[in-house]
Amino acid sequence: MNASPLECDYLVIGAGATALAFVDTLLSESAEATVLIVDRHHRPGGHWNDAYPFVRLHQPSEWYGVASRELSHGSKDTHGFNAGLYGLASGVEVLAYFDQVMQQRFLPSGRVRWLPMSEYAAGTNGAHRVTSLIGGDAQSVTVRKKVVNATHAQTAVPSTHGPKYTVADGTNCVPLNRLPQVGRPHAACTVVGSGKTGMDAILWLLENGVAPSRIRWIMPRDAWMLNRANLQPGIENFERNMGSAVDQFEAIAKASSVPDLFARLEQREQLLRIDEAVQPTTYRCATVAPGELAQLRRIADIVRLGRVRGIEPDRIVLQHGSIAADPDTLYIDCSASAIVMPPALPVFDRDRINLLMVRTCQPLFSAALIAWVESHVADPAAQNALCAVVPSPEHPIDWLRMWAVTLANGARWRQHAGLQAWLMQCRLNAIAVYMRGVKPDDTVRLALVRQSGIMAGAAAAALPTLLTAARLNETGQPA
Protein backbone atom coordinates (compact mmCIF):
# COMPACT_ATOMS: atom_id res chain seq x y z
CA MET A 1 0.00 0.00 0.00
CA ASN A 2 1.05 3.60 -0.51
CA ALA A 3 1.56 5.82 2.53
CA SER A 4 1.09 9.57 2.68
CA PRO A 5 3.38 11.58 0.37
CA LEU A 6 6.35 13.45 1.79
CA GLU A 7 8.01 16.76 0.96
CA CYS A 8 11.48 18.09 1.73
CA ASP A 9 14.10 20.51 0.48
CA TYR A 10 16.88 17.92 0.40
CA LEU A 11 16.51 14.17 0.05
CA VAL A 12 19.70 12.51 1.27
CA ILE A 13 20.32 8.96 0.07
CA GLY A 14 22.28 7.17 2.77
CA ALA A 15 22.87 7.73 6.47
CA GLY A 16 26.57 6.96 6.53
CA ALA A 17 29.32 9.20 7.79
CA THR A 18 29.50 11.49 4.75
CA ALA A 19 25.72 11.94 4.68
CA LEU A 20 25.62 12.90 8.34
CA ALA A 21 28.54 15.31 7.95
CA PHE A 22 26.70 17.01 5.08
CA VAL A 23 23.39 17.28 6.92
CA ASP A 24 25.03 18.56 10.09
CA THR A 25 26.68 21.49 8.31
CA LEU A 26 23.55 22.14 6.24
CA LEU A 27 21.55 22.55 9.46
CA SER A 28 24.16 24.94 10.84
CA GLU A 29 24.49 27.06 7.72
CA SER A 30 20.88 27.09 6.46
CA ALA A 31 18.19 28.36 8.81
CA GLU A 32 15.19 26.73 7.15
CA ALA A 33 16.29 23.79 4.98
CA THR A 34 14.41 20.55 5.62
CA VAL A 35 15.99 17.15 5.06
CA LEU A 36 14.73 13.61 4.50
CA ILE A 37 17.36 10.90 5.08
CA VAL A 38 16.78 7.43 3.62
CA ASP A 39 18.96 4.43 4.43
CA ARG A 40 18.77 0.63 4.25
CA HIS A 41 20.30 0.17 7.70
CA HIS A 42 18.34 0.21 10.95
CA ARG A 43 20.52 2.90 12.51
CA PRO A 44 22.76 5.69 11.25
CA GLY A 45 26.40 5.00 10.48
CA GLY A 46 26.39 3.33 7.07
CA HIS A 47 29.09 0.68 6.69
CA TRP A 48 29.97 0.96 10.38
CA ASN A 49 26.86 -1.17 10.98
CA ASP A 50 28.44 -4.00 8.99
CA ALA A 51 32.05 -3.67 10.09
CA TYR A 52 33.96 -6.26 12.11
CA PRO A 53 33.60 -6.04 15.89
CA PHE A 54 37.18 -4.94 16.57
CA VAL A 55 37.26 -2.22 13.92
CA ARG A 56 38.64 1.18 14.86
CA LEU A 57 39.18 4.43 13.08
CA HIS A 58 42.42 4.54 11.14
CA GLN A 59 42.80 8.27 11.75
CA PRO A 60 42.62 10.33 14.96
CA SER A 61 39.09 10.80 16.30
CA GLU A 62 39.81 14.54 16.59
CA TRP A 63 38.65 15.31 13.04
CA TYR A 64 36.20 12.48 12.37
CA GLY A 65 32.40 12.71 12.49
CA VAL A 66 30.29 15.85 12.09
CA ALA A 67 31.38 19.44 12.57
CA SER A 68 29.06 20.28 15.47
CA ARG A 69 30.00 17.45 17.84
CA GLU A 70 33.31 16.19 19.20
CA LEU A 71 34.15 12.50 18.99
CA SER A 72 37.62 12.52 20.50
CA HIS A 73 38.30 12.18 24.22
CA GLY A 74 41.53 14.10 23.69
CA SER A 75 43.72 11.35 25.13
CA LYS A 76 46.58 9.23 23.83
CA ASP A 77 46.72 5.46 23.76
CA THR A 78 48.95 4.14 26.54
CA HIS A 79 49.17 0.54 25.34
CA GLY A 80 48.80 -1.50 22.19
CA PHE A 81 50.33 -0.97 18.77
CA ASN A 82 49.08 2.66 18.60
CA ALA A 83 50.67 3.56 21.96
CA GLY A 84 51.89 7.14 22.20
CA LEU A 85 49.51 8.41 19.53
CA TYR A 86 46.06 9.89 19.97
CA GLY A 87 43.21 7.43 20.38
CA LEU A 88 41.25 5.80 17.58
CA ALA A 89 37.52 5.47 18.29
CA SER A 90 36.15 1.93 18.21
CA GLY A 91 33.30 0.91 15.95
CA VAL A 92 30.99 0.81 18.97
CA GLU A 93 31.97 4.38 19.85
CA VAL A 94 31.45 5.59 16.29
CA LEU A 95 27.98 4.03 16.04
CA ALA A 96 26.98 5.48 19.41
CA TYR A 97 28.27 8.87 18.29
CA PHE A 98 26.26 8.85 15.06
CA ASP A 99 23.17 7.68 16.93
CA GLN A 100 23.55 10.64 19.28
CA VAL A 101 23.95 12.99 16.32
CA MET A 102 20.66 11.70 14.91
CA GLN A 103 18.71 11.53 18.18
CA GLN A 104 20.07 14.60 19.94
CA ARG A 105 20.68 17.02 17.05
CA PHE A 106 19.00 16.11 13.79
CA LEU A 107 15.57 14.92 14.90
CA PRO A 108 15.05 17.52 17.68
CA SER A 109 15.74 20.27 15.12
CA GLY A 110 12.33 19.57 13.58
CA ARG A 111 13.94 19.90 10.14
CA VAL A 112 15.15 16.33 9.65
CA ARG A 113 13.10 13.21 9.03
CA TRP A 114 14.85 9.86 9.00
CA LEU A 115 13.55 6.73 7.28
CA PRO A 116 15.70 3.74 8.30
CA MET A 117 15.23 0.29 6.75
CA SER A 118 14.05 1.99 3.58
CA GLU A 119 15.05 1.99 -0.06
CA TYR A 120 15.13 4.98 -2.41
CA ALA A 121 14.02 4.86 -6.04
CA ALA A 122 14.68 7.75 -8.42
CA GLY A 123 11.77 9.65 -9.87
CA THR A 124 11.28 12.42 -12.41
CA ASN A 125 10.22 16.06 -12.18
CA GLY A 126 10.98 16.22 -8.48
CA ALA A 127 8.96 13.10 -7.63
CA HIS A 128 10.74 10.24 -5.91
CA ARG A 129 9.78 7.08 -4.07
CA VAL A 130 10.85 5.51 -0.78
CA THR A 131 9.82 1.97 0.15
CA SER A 132 10.01 0.39 3.60
CA LEU A 133 12.08 -2.80 3.54
CA ILE A 134 10.07 -4.18 6.46
CA GLY A 135 6.51 -2.92 6.10
CA GLY A 136 6.53 -2.69 2.32
CA ASP A 137 4.77 0.69 2.26
CA ALA A 138 5.85 3.06 -0.50
CA GLN A 139 5.81 6.83 -0.16
CA SER A 140 6.24 9.40 -2.89
CA VAL A 141 8.58 12.26 -2.08
CA THR A 142 8.57 15.73 -3.59
CA VAL A 143 12.02 17.30 -3.42
CA ARG A 144 11.91 21.08 -3.57
CA LYS A 145 15.64 21.61 -3.99
CA LYS A 146 18.08 18.74 -4.48
CA VAL A 147 18.73 15.03 -4.08
CA VAL A 148 22.00 14.36 -2.26
CA ASN A 149 23.73 11.12 -3.20
CA ALA A 150 25.85 9.96 -0.27
CA THR A 151 26.34 6.44 -1.64
CA HIS A 152 29.18 7.09 -4.10
CA ALA A 153 31.84 6.43 -1.46
CA GLN A 154 30.50 2.97 -0.76
CA THR A 155 32.73 0.99 1.55
CA ALA A 156 32.76 -2.75 0.92
CA VAL A 157 33.34 -4.90 4.02
CA PRO A 158 33.80 -8.69 4.29
CA SER A 159 30.45 -9.25 6.01
CA THR A 160 28.49 -7.89 3.04
CA HIS A 161 30.77 -8.98 0.18
CA GLY A 162 31.69 -12.65 0.05
CA PRO A 163 34.92 -13.97 -1.47
CA LYS A 164 35.30 -13.92 -5.25
CA TYR A 165 37.19 -17.20 -5.16
CA THR A 166 36.00 -20.76 -4.70
CA VAL A 167 36.18 -22.43 -1.30
CA ALA A 168 36.17 -26.22 -1.26
CA ASP A 169 34.02 -28.19 1.16
CA GLY A 170 35.78 -28.92 4.40
CA THR A 171 37.84 -25.74 4.22
CA ASN A 172 37.45 -23.29 7.09
CA CYS A 173 37.12 -19.82 5.54
CA VAL A 174 35.45 -17.04 7.55
CA PRO A 175 34.82 -13.34 6.95
CA LEU A 176 36.76 -11.00 9.21
CA ASN A 177 33.60 -10.32 11.25
CA ARG A 178 33.58 -13.91 12.52
CA LEU A 179 37.21 -14.00 13.57
CA PRO A 180 36.49 -13.32 17.29
CA GLN A 181 34.02 -16.23 17.27
CA VAL A 182 36.58 -18.83 16.23
CA GLY A 183 36.59 -21.18 19.17
CA ARG A 184 39.80 -23.17 18.83
CA PRO A 185 43.44 -22.85 17.78
CA HIS A 186 44.39 -23.77 14.23
CA ALA A 187 47.68 -25.05 12.92
CA ALA A 188 47.90 -22.00 10.67
CA CYS A 189 46.02 -18.79 9.89
CA THR A 190 45.97 -17.32 6.39
CA VAL A 191 44.77 -13.77 5.81
CA VAL A 192 43.49 -13.21 2.27
CA GLY A 193 43.78 -9.53 1.32
CA SER A 194 46.41 -6.82 1.61
CA GLY A 195 44.21 -3.80 2.32
CA LYS A 196 43.54 -2.15 5.64
CA THR A 197 41.14 -4.92 6.72
CA GLY A 198 43.88 -7.45 6.03
CA MET A 199 46.26 -5.42 8.18
CA ASP A 200 43.68 -5.27 10.96
CA ALA A 201 43.28 -9.06 10.78
CA ILE A 202 47.04 -9.59 11.12
CA LEU A 203 47.25 -7.19 14.05
CA TRP A 204 44.26 -8.83 15.78
CA LEU A 205 45.83 -12.28 15.44
CA LEU A 206 49.11 -11.04 16.89
CA GLU A 207 47.35 -9.22 19.73
CA ASN A 208 45.51 -12.41 20.59
CA GLY A 209 48.51 -14.65 20.87
CA VAL A 210 48.95 -16.20 17.42
CA ALA A 211 52.66 -16.59 16.71
CA PRO A 212 53.92 -14.81 13.57
CA SER A 213 55.27 -18.15 12.31
CA ARG A 214 51.70 -19.50 12.12
CA ILE A 215 50.40 -16.59 10.05
CA ARG A 216 50.46 -16.48 6.26
CA TRP A 217 49.50 -13.30 4.39
CA ILE A 218 48.16 -13.41 0.84
CA MET A 219 49.20 -10.01 -0.54
CA PRO A 220 48.07 -9.45 -4.14
CA ARG A 221 49.50 -5.93 -4.10
CA ASP A 222 51.88 -4.05 -1.83
CA ALA A 223 50.69 -0.62 -0.78
CA TRP A 224 52.05 2.75 0.15
CA MET A 225 50.60 3.87 3.49
CA LEU A 226 50.37 7.18 5.31
CA ASN A 227 52.31 7.55 8.55
CA ARG A 228 49.79 8.17 11.35
CA ALA A 229 52.50 9.72 13.52
CA ASN A 230 52.50 12.67 11.10
CA LEU A 231 48.74 13.19 11.51
CA GLN A 232 48.32 13.96 15.20
CA PRO A 233 46.31 16.64 17.01
CA GLY A 234 47.72 18.53 19.98
CA ILE A 235 49.94 21.57 20.11
CA GLU A 236 52.87 19.33 21.06
CA ASN A 237 52.66 17.81 17.56
CA PHE A 238 52.43 21.10 15.67
CA GLU A 239 56.02 21.09 14.42
CA ARG A 240 55.80 17.50 13.21
CA ASN A 241 52.41 18.03 11.51
CA MET A 242 53.44 21.19 9.70
CA GLY A 243 56.87 19.76 9.02
CA SER A 244 55.16 16.79 7.40
CA ALA A 245 53.29 19.10 5.03
CA VAL A 246 56.52 20.94 4.20
CA ASP A 247 58.30 17.63 3.56
CA GLN A 248 55.58 16.44 1.19
CA PHE A 249 55.42 19.70 -0.74
CA GLU A 250 59.20 19.92 -0.93
CA ALA A 251 59.37 16.35 -2.23
CA ILE A 252 56.95 17.25 -5.02
CA ALA A 253 58.80 20.47 -5.83
CA LYS A 254 62.27 18.90 -5.96
CA ALA A 255 61.52 15.46 -7.42
CA SER A 256 63.15 14.80 -10.79
CA SER A 257 60.73 11.96 -11.57
CA VAL A 258 57.86 10.02 -10.03
CA PRO A 259 60.19 7.27 -8.70
CA ASP A 260 62.36 9.99 -7.19
CA LEU A 261 59.25 11.53 -5.59
CA PHE A 262 58.32 8.32 -3.78
CA ALA A 263 61.92 7.77 -2.72
CA ARG A 264 61.92 11.23 -1.14
CA LEU A 265 58.56 10.64 0.55
CA GLU A 266 59.74 7.36 2.01
CA GLN A 267 63.08 8.80 3.12
CA ARG A 268 61.19 11.47 5.08
CA GLU A 269 58.77 8.88 6.52
CA GLN A 270 55.74 10.45 4.85
CA LEU A 271 54.84 7.19 3.08
CA LEU A 272 55.54 3.72 4.47
CA ARG A 273 55.51 0.18 3.06
CA ILE A 274 55.61 -3.33 4.46
CA ASP A 275 58.76 -4.46 2.67
CA GLU A 276 61.35 -1.92 1.56
CA ALA A 277 62.54 -4.39 -1.09
CA VAL A 278 59.13 -4.61 -2.81
CA GLN A 279 57.82 -1.73 -4.90
CA PRO A 280 54.19 -0.91 -3.99
CA THR A 281 51.64 -0.94 -6.79
CA THR A 282 48.68 0.53 -4.93
CA TYR A 283 47.76 3.47 -2.69
CA ARG A 284 44.36 3.70 -0.96
CA CYS A 285 44.87 6.31 1.80
CA ALA A 286 45.51 3.58 4.38
CA THR A 287 47.06 4.93 7.58
CA VAL A 288 49.37 2.97 9.83
CA ALA A 289 51.17 3.71 13.09
CA PRO A 290 54.90 2.95 13.27
CA GLY A 291 54.13 0.44 16.02
CA GLU A 292 51.61 -1.33 13.81
CA LEU A 293 54.04 -1.42 10.91
CA ALA A 294 56.68 -3.03 13.10
CA GLN A 295 54.20 -5.78 13.98
CA LEU A 296 53.13 -6.32 10.37
CA ARG A 297 56.77 -6.74 9.39
CA ARG A 298 57.01 -9.72 11.77
CA ILE A 299 55.04 -11.79 9.23
CA ALA A 300 57.62 -13.63 7.13
CA ASP A 301 55.26 -15.83 5.10
CA ILE A 302 53.90 -13.28 2.62
CA VAL A 303 52.60 -14.71 -0.66
CA ARG A 304 52.80 -12.42 -3.70
CA LEU A 305 51.28 -14.55 -6.47
CA GLY A 306 48.29 -12.36 -7.32
CA ARG A 307 44.71 -12.84 -6.22
CA VAL A 308 43.29 -16.07 -4.85
CA ARG A 309 41.34 -18.15 -7.37
CA GLY A 310 40.40 -21.02 -5.08
CA ILE A 311 41.05 -22.57 -1.69
CA GLU A 312 41.28 -26.34 -1.47
CA PRO A 313 41.87 -28.50 1.63
CA ASP A 314 45.61 -28.76 1.04
CA ARG A 315 46.50 -25.91 -1.32
CA ILE A 316 45.73 -22.36 -2.43
CA VAL A 317 45.31 -21.61 -6.13
CA LEU A 318 46.34 -18.09 -7.12
CA GLN A 319 46.65 -16.10 -10.33
CA HIS A 320 50.34 -16.90 -10.74
CA GLY A 321 50.71 -20.29 -9.13
CA SER A 322 49.66 -22.63 -6.34
CA ILE A 323 51.06 -23.20 -2.86
CA ALA A 324 50.64 -26.02 -0.39
CA ALA A 325 48.55 -25.40 2.72
CA ASP A 326 48.03 -27.17 6.03
CA PRO A 327 44.57 -28.81 6.05
CA ASP A 328 44.02 -27.29 9.51
CA THR A 329 44.29 -23.71 8.25
CA LEU A 330 41.87 -20.97 9.23
CA TYR A 331 41.37 -18.65 6.25
CA ILE A 332 40.27 -15.09 7.04
CA ASP A 333 38.67 -13.38 4.05
CA CYS A 334 39.64 -9.71 3.81
CA SER A 335 39.38 -9.49 0.03
CA ALA A 336 36.48 -7.01 -0.19
CA SER A 337 37.62 -3.73 -1.71
CA ALA A 338 37.26 -1.17 1.08
CA ILE A 339 36.95 1.73 -1.36
CA VAL A 340 34.57 1.44 -4.31
CA MET A 341 35.59 3.78 -7.11
CA PRO A 342 32.92 6.47 -7.65
CA PRO A 343 31.67 7.53 -11.07
CA ALA A 344 33.10 10.56 -12.87
CA LEU A 345 30.56 13.19 -11.83
CA PRO A 346 30.69 16.80 -10.68
CA VAL A 347 29.72 17.56 -7.09
CA PHE A 348 26.93 19.92 -8.15
CA ASP A 349 24.96 18.36 -10.99
CA ARG A 350 21.78 20.39 -11.62
CA ASP A 351 19.22 19.11 -9.10
CA ARG A 352 21.65 16.63 -7.55
CA ILE A 353 24.59 16.87 -5.20
CA ASN A 354 27.20 14.11 -5.32
CA LEU A 355 29.16 13.76 -2.09
CA LEU A 356 32.66 13.21 -3.42
CA MET A 357 36.07 14.15 -2.04
CA VAL A 358 37.32 17.71 -2.43
CA ARG A 359 40.44 17.24 -0.27
CA THR A 360 42.80 14.28 -0.34
CA CYS A 361 41.72 11.35 1.87
CA GLN A 362 39.11 13.40 3.78
CA PRO A 363 35.55 12.43 2.70
CA LEU A 364 33.77 13.71 5.84
CA PHE A 365 35.44 17.10 5.75
CA SER A 366 34.61 17.19 2.04
CA ALA A 367 30.91 16.51 2.68
CA ALA A 368 30.74 19.28 5.27
CA LEU A 369 32.45 21.76 2.95
CA ILE A 370 30.05 20.85 0.13
CA ALA A 371 27.14 21.64 2.47
CA TRP A 372 28.68 25.02 3.30
CA VAL A 373 29.06 25.83 -0.40
CA GLU A 374 25.47 24.74 -1.10
CA SER A 375 24.26 27.06 1.67
CA HIS A 376 26.26 30.15 0.71
CA VAL A 377 27.11 30.01 -3.02
CA ALA A 378 24.24 30.22 -5.51
CA ASP A 379 25.92 29.94 -8.91
CA PRO A 380 26.44 26.29 -9.99
CA ALA A 381 29.66 27.07 -11.85
CA ALA A 382 31.07 28.83 -8.79
CA GLN A 383 29.98 25.92 -6.61
CA ASN A 384 31.83 23.38 -8.73
CA ALA A 385 34.87 25.67 -8.98
CA LEU A 386 35.15 25.49 -5.19
CA CYS A 387 34.47 21.75 -5.16
CA ALA A 388 36.58 20.18 -7.90
CA VAL A 389 36.52 16.43 -7.36
CA VAL A 390 39.63 14.81 -5.91
CA PRO A 391 40.05 11.40 -7.58
CA SER A 392 39.68 8.35 -5.39
CA PRO A 393 42.98 6.52 -4.95
CA GLU A 394 43.91 3.23 -6.54
CA HIS A 395 47.49 3.49 -7.84
CA PRO A 396 50.57 5.14 -6.32
CA ILE A 397 50.42 7.99 -8.84
CA ASP A 398 47.01 8.87 -7.41
CA TRP A 399 48.79 10.24 -4.34
CA LEU A 400 50.10 12.95 -6.66
CA ARG A 401 46.86 13.38 -8.60
CA MET A 402 44.95 13.86 -5.36
CA TRP A 403 47.35 16.56 -4.23
CA ALA A 404 47.05 18.34 -7.59
CA VAL A 405 43.32 18.90 -7.12
CA THR A 406 43.62 19.46 -3.37
CA LEU A 407 46.13 22.28 -3.80
CA ALA A 408 44.07 23.89 -6.57
CA ASN A 409 40.92 23.72 -4.44
CA GLY A 410 42.78 25.17 -1.46
CA ALA A 411 43.97 28.12 -3.52
CA ARG A 412 40.39 28.91 -4.52
CA TRP A 413 39.12 28.52 -0.95
CA ARG A 414 41.63 31.12 0.26
CA GLN A 415 40.08 33.64 -2.12
CA HIS A 416 36.64 33.23 -0.49
CA ALA A 417 36.57 35.09 2.83
CA GLY A 418 33.42 33.43 4.15
CA LEU A 419 34.60 29.93 3.35
CA GLN A 420 38.02 30.65 4.81
CA ALA A 421 36.46 31.81 8.08
CA TRP A 422 34.40 28.61 8.28
CA LEU A 423 37.43 26.46 7.52
CA MET A 424 39.43 27.87 10.40
CA GLN A 425 36.78 26.92 12.97
CA CYS A 426 35.65 23.58 11.51
CA ARG A 427 36.69 20.62 13.68
CA LEU A 428 36.72 18.34 10.62
CA ASN A 429 39.47 20.48 9.09
CA ALA A 430 42.74 18.92 10.22
CA ILE A 431 44.58 22.18 9.54
CA ALA A 432 42.26 24.05 11.93
CA VAL A 433 42.87 21.36 14.54
CA TYR A 434 46.62 21.75 14.09
CA MET A 435 46.31 25.52 14.64
CA ARG A 436 44.54 25.19 17.99
CA GLY A 437 46.69 26.74 20.68
CA VAL A 438 48.94 28.65 18.28
CA LYS A 439 49.02 32.22 19.61
CA PRO A 440 49.21 35.32 17.38
CA ASP A 441 52.65 36.17 18.78
CA ASP A 442 54.09 32.67 18.27
CA THR A 443 56.51 33.76 15.58
CA VAL A 444 58.30 30.40 15.31
CA ARG A 445 55.18 28.36 14.61
CA LEU A 446 53.65 30.99 12.35
CA ALA A 447 56.87 31.03 10.34
CA LEU A 448 56.45 27.29 9.81
CA VAL A 449 52.90 27.91 8.57
CA ARG A 450 54.24 30.45 6.08
CA GLN A 451 56.93 28.02 4.97
CA SER A 452 54.23 25.41 4.35
CA GLY A 453 52.35 27.89 2.17
CA ILE A 454 55.46 28.75 0.18
CA MET A 455 56.28 25.10 -0.41
CA ALA A 456 52.66 24.37 -1.37
CA GLY A 457 53.01 26.96 -4.13
CA ALA A 458 56.25 25.38 -5.29
CA ALA A 459 54.60 21.95 -5.29
CA ALA A 460 51.64 23.23 -7.30
CA ALA A 461 54.04 24.63 -9.89
CA ALA A 462 55.95 21.34 -10.17
CA LEU A 463 52.91 19.05 -10.29
CA PRO A 464 52.07 19.40 -14.02
CA THR A 465 55.56 18.30 -15.07
CA LEU A 466 55.51 15.22 -12.84
CA LEU A 467 52.00 14.25 -13.92
CA THR A 468 52.88 14.67 -17.59
CA ALA A 469 55.90 12.43 -17.12
CA ALA A 470 53.69 9.86 -15.40
CA ARG A 471 51.17 9.89 -18.24
CA LEU A 472 53.89 9.46 -20.85
CA ASN A 473 55.32 6.57 -18.89
CA GLU A 474 51.90 4.89 -18.72
CA THR A 475 51.60 5.00 -22.52
CA GLY A 476 55.03 3.47 -22.97
CA GLN A 477 56.65 6.67 -24.22
CA PRO A 478 59.79 8.15 -22.68
CA ALA A 479 59.12 9.76 -19.30
Name each model feature, range by range:
Residues 11-13, 140-155, 190-192, 326-337:
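Short hydrophobic core segments
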Residues 19-29, 178-226, 365-416:
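Rossmann-like dinucleotide/flavin-binding elements
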Residues 40-97, 218-275:
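Glycine-rich active-site loop/strand segments that organize a redox cofactor
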Residues 84, 90, 94-97, 149-209, ...:
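Glycine-rich dinucleotide-binding loop and its adjacent helix/turn
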Residues 1-10, 28-33, 141, 153-180, ...:
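Extreme N-terminal leader/targeting segments of oxidoreductases
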Residues 268-269, 273-341, 435-479:
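C-terminal catalytic lobe of FAD-dependent flavoproteins
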Residues 203, 302-444:
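Glycine-enriched catalytic-core subsegment of oxygenase/oxidase enzymes
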Residues 78-157, 275-278, 285, 292-318, ...:
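Feature captures the FAD/FMN-dependent oxidoreductase FAD-binding
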